[in-house]
């Protein structure tokens, strides 16, 4: 295996700005910013969305109609599809 070709693996603090949640995990992401937490200095990365704020994980996802697409189509355009008898 070739030496010095892999990025350094280190502990990084990710900050979800929309939920104001911090995650300390191992990562190879490159960043110039740092933050001090628990008496140590870590690389710092901001996130727009994470599991702390994503609607799928928070349970605040939008509910779609219980009917299928065919039922919605007939509801919207059903009057145009009825056969007229003269």
Curated annotation (Swiss-Prot):
InterPro entries assigned to the protein according to its UniProt record, in alphabetical order: Ribosomal_bL28/bL31-like_sf, Ribosomal_bL31, Ribosomal_bL31_B, Ribosomal_bL31_sf
Organism of this sequence: Yersinia pestis
Keyword field: Ribonucleoprotein, Ribosomal protein
MF (Gene Ontology): structural constituent of ribosome
Entry GO terms, CC: ribonucleoprotein complex; ribosome
Complexes and interactors: Part of the 50S ribosomal subunit.
BP-aspect Gene Ontology terms: translation
Entry keyword annotation includes Cell membrane: no
Protein name per Swiss-Prot or TrEMBL: Large ribosomal subunit protein bL31B
Family to which the UniProt record says this protein belongs: Belongs to the bacterial ribosomal protein bL31 family. Type B subfamily.
Induction context: May be induced under zinc-limiting conditions; in that case may be repressed by the zinc uptake regulation protein zur.
